[in-house]
C-alpha cells in the first residue's frame, strides 16, 4: 500500500531496498538465528545470485556465436545478434528474470553446499574466520574475471524484468511490489521451517550441538542444510537487487555488507522471523531517510553554536561505524533484539504450584515393553573396550553385557571412567580398541545420531537440555529420529506432515504425563526456567521420546534432595517394570541396591567387580576402591 499512499519515487525505491535487505536478513537468520552458525561472509552468496542474473541478462557480455549456443536459442535463453564491429554474430543473453529467481537461488545454494561441506565441522571463531575469508574471496574473483564479470568495472546493461509485456525499466513501484512478494514468501518459508522437525533440529544444534547429536540429529547434514537454504535466500535476493539497479560491481558485496546484514538480524531479534524483517527495514530507513536529514540538523546546530566540526559531519559516510555502535549497544543491553524469539514464561497458578503430584500411567511405553521384556539374550555387548587420552588410559579392556529388560548399574569413584564408557557407547568418543555390539550389530565408531537411530538414548551427567526451547519442544526434538518430515514436507505442510506433527505433539504430552504435574503444566515453559529436578526429569523425558531399546542414565539423581531422589528412583523403577532396559551411573548406592539387577564397578578405567548388588557390596576390591564408602550399600 505504501506506493499508493506516498508517490515519491525515491522513497519507494528506498522501501524496495529496505525490503531487499529484509530478505537477506531472513536468510542470515536461518544460518545464525536458527542453526547458530556465525557467518561473516554472507554477502558472498548475495554476490553469487546477483552475478548469476547479471551474466545471464547483460548486453555487456557478448561472446562469439557458435553452434554451442543453438540449443539455448531454441529454449529462448539467448539470441543471435550482429556484432558491434560488423563482423560475425555474438550471443545476447536474455534469460527471464522470473526464471532466474529460483535458478540463482539454486546456484547460490550449490555454492553454499560446496563451501559448507568441508568447513561446517568447524565451530565458533574458526567458522567465523573461514566465512569471512570466503566473503572476501568472491568479490576478488569477480574483480579478476573480466571475461565473465567485466572485472572491476562491473556489469552494466542488466535487463530489467518484464511481466505480461510490461517492462519495469527504472520505475520503482513494480520493484517495490516484487520485493513485498519476495519477503512475504521468504517469511512464510522461514516460519514453516522454524516450527517443523527441521527447525527444531537447527535450534537444538544452536543451543547444544553435542546434545543434539546424542538425541538423533545429524549435525553436519542439518548445518549444511541451513547454510544452503540461507544461501538460496541470498541468491534470489541478489537477482532481484541487480535487476533493480541494472548493474553489478564487486564493491556492492564487500565485507561491510555482511556486517550490516548481521546487525539487522541482531537488532531485530535473532531467531525471530518478524523481528529480523522489522530490524532490517528500520535500519535501512535510518540509513536512507534520516541520516542525511540528521546531518543537516547537525550542520545547522554547528553554525548556531559556532562549532566548526559539527558543520562538516556527514553521518551517511559513517554508516559502518553507526552500525557497529548499534551492534555493541544491542549486545550489551538487549541481546534478544527488539522482538525476542523466546516467549515469556507464563507463571503457574497457585493451585498448579501446590497440587498433589499425580503421574500418568506407563502404558505409554507398552509398545516398547512388549518387545523388550527381560530375556537371556544380550542387548548390549562391550568387549575389550579401551580408550586413551594421550598417555592416560581412561578405559582399559572393559567388558560388559546388558541383558534385554534388565537394569545394570555402573559405579565407581570419580574419574574411574564411567562417563567415558557412556560417551564411547553412544558415539561421542571413538575407542582405541575393542568392540561394541548392540542388538547384534557393531556400533563402535558410529556417529551419535546413528547410535540413537539404532535405539540407544542417554542423559548426561551435567544436564544438557536446549535452554531456549520449551519443555514440549525439548521432548519433540527427542523424537527427531522417529519422524520423517524433511524440509520439503515442512514447506508444503501436506496432510501427512500435519498428521505426523499432531501425533508427535500428542505423544510428547503423554511422555510428560509420566512425570505428572511436575512437567505437564510446564510444557510451554522454557527449559532454562525449570528447577534443577525438573530439568533432570525433562532430560529423561526427552530420551524416552526417541523410543529407545536401551536407556543410559548418567547420575540421574545427582543434585537432588532425598525426597526428589526417592520420587525419581520410583519412576525409573516403573520404567523397568514396563520393560525398559536401563544402564545407569549412580553414586547414591541405596538407589543402586533398590534398582539394579547387576552392578559393574570401575576403578581407574578397569572393571574390578561385577555381579548382583548383594555380592558386589562385600567385594574386597570394591571396599578398597571406595575407601570404606561401601558401607552405603548396607
Locate the predicted segments by residue.
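Transmembrane alpha-helices and adjacent helix-loop boundaries
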Residues: 1-367
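The feature captures the beta-strand-to-loop junction immediately N-terminal to the Walker
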Residues: 411-413
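Helix-to-loop junction immediately C-terminal to a conserved catalytic motif
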Residues: 426
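Conserved ABC transporter NBD signature motif
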Residues: 434-442, 454, 507, 513, ...
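Conserved catalytic motifs of ABC-family nucleotide-binding domains
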Residues: 547
Amino acid at each position: 500500500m505504501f506506493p499508493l499512499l506516498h508517490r515519491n519515487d525515491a522513497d519507494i525505491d528506498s522501501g524496495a531496498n529496505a525490503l531487499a535487505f529484509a530478505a537477506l536478513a531472513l536468510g542470515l537468520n536461518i544460518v545464525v538465528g536458527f542453526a547458530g552458525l556465525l557467518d561473516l561472509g554472507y554477502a558472498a552468496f548475495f554476490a553469487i545470485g546477483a552475478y548469476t542474473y547479471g551474466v545471464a541478462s547483460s548486453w555487456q557480455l557478448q561472446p562469439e556465436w557458435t553452434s554451442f549456443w543453438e540449443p539455448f536459442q531454441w529454449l529462448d535463453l539467448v539470441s543471435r545478434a550482429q556484432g558491434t564491429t560488423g563482423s560475425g554474430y555474438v550471443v545476447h543473453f536474455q534469460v527471464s528474470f522470473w526464471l532466474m529467481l529460483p535458478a540463482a537461488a539454486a546456484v547460490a545454494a550449490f555454492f553454499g553446499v560446496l563451501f559448507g561441506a568441508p568447513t561446517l565441522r568447524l565451530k565458533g571463531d574458526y567458522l567465523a574466520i573461514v566465512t569471512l575469508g570466503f566473503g572476501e574471496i568472491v568479490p576478488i574473483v569477480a574483480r579478476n574475471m573480466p571475461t565473465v564479470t567485466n572485472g572491476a568495472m562491473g556489469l552494466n546493461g542488466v535487463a530489467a524484468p518484464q511481466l505480461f509485456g510490461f517492462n519495469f525499466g527504472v520505475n520503482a513501484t513494480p520493484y517495490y511490489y516484487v520485493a513485498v512478494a519476495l519477503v512475504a514468501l521468504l517469511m512464510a518459508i522461514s516460519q514453516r521451517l522454524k516450527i517443523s522437525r527441521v527447525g527444531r533440529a537447527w535450534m537444538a544444534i544452536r543451543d547444544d550441538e553435542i546434545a543434539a547429536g546424542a538425541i538423533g540429529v545429524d549435525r553436519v547434514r542439518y548445518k549444511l542444510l541451513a547454510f544452503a537454504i540461507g544461501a538460496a535466500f541470498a541468491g534470489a535476493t541478489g537477482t532481484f537487487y541487480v535487476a533493480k539497479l541494472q548493474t553489478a560491481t564487486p564493491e556492492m558485496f564487500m565485507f561491510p555488507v555482511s556486517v550490516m546484514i548481521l546487525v539487522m538480524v541482531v537488532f531485530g531479534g535473532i531467531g525471530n522471523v518478524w523481528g529480523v524483517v522489522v530490524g532490517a527495514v528500520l535500519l535501512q530507513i535510518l540509513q536512507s531517510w534520516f541520516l542525511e536529514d540528521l546531518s543537516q540538523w547537525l550542520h545547522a546546530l554547528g553554525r548556531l553554536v559556532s562549532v566548526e566540526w559539527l558543520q562538516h559531519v556527514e553521518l551517511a559516510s559513517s554508516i559502518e561505524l553507526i552500525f557497529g555502535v548499534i551492534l555493541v549497544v544491542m549486545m550489551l543491553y538487549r541481546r534478544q533484539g527488539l522482538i525476542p524469539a523466546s516467549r515469556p514464561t507464563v507463571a503457574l497458578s497457585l493451585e498448579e504450584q501446590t497440587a498433589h503430584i499425580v503421574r500418568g500411567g506407563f502404558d505409554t511405553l507398552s509398545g516398547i515393553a512388549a518387545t523388550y521384556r527381560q530375556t537371556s539374550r544380550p542387548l548390549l555387548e562391550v568387549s575389550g573396550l579401551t580408550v586413551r587420552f594421550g598417555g592416560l588410559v581412561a578405559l582399559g579392556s572393559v567388558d560388559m553385557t546388558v541383558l534385554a529388560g534388565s537394569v545394570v548399574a555402573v559405579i565407581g569413584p570419580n574419574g574411574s571412567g564411567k562417563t567415558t564408557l557412556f560417551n564411547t557407547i553412544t558415539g561421542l568418543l571413538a575407542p582405541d580398541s575393542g568392540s561394541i555390539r548392540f542388538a547384534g550389530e557393531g556400533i563402535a565408531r558410529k556417529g551419535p545420531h546413528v547410535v540413537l537411530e539404532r535405539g540407544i538414548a542417554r542423559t548426561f551427567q551435567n544436564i544438557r537440555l536446549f535452554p531456549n526451547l520449551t519443555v514440549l519442544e525439548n521432548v519433540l526434538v527427542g523424537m527427531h529420529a522417529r519422524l520423517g518430515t524433511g524440509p520439503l514436507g515442512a514447506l508444503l505442510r501436506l496432510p501427512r506432515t500435519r498428521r505426523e506433527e499432531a501425533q508427535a505433539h500428542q505423544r510428547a504430552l503423554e511422555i510428560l504425563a509420566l512425570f505428572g504435574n511436575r512437567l505437564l503444566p510446564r510444557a510451554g515453559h522454557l527449559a532454562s526456567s525449570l528447577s534443577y529436578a525438573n530439568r533432570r526429569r525433562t532430560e529423561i523425558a526427552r530420551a524416552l521420546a526417541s523410543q529407545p531399546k536401551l536407556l543410559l542414565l548418567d547420575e540421574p539423581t545427582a543434585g537432588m534432595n532425598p525426597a526428589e531422589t526417592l520420587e525419581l528412583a520410583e519412576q525409573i523403577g516403573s520404567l523397568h517394570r514396563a520393560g525398559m532396559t536401563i544402564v545407569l551411573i549412580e553414586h547414591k548406592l541405596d538407589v543402586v541396591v533398590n534398582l539394579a539387577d547387576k552392578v559393574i564397578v570401575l576403578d581407574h578405567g578397569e572393571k574390578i567387580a561385577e555381579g548382583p548388588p548383594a555380592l558386589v557390596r562385600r567385594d574386597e576390591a570394591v571396599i578398597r576402591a571406595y575407601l570404606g564408602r561401601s558401607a552405603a550399600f548396607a
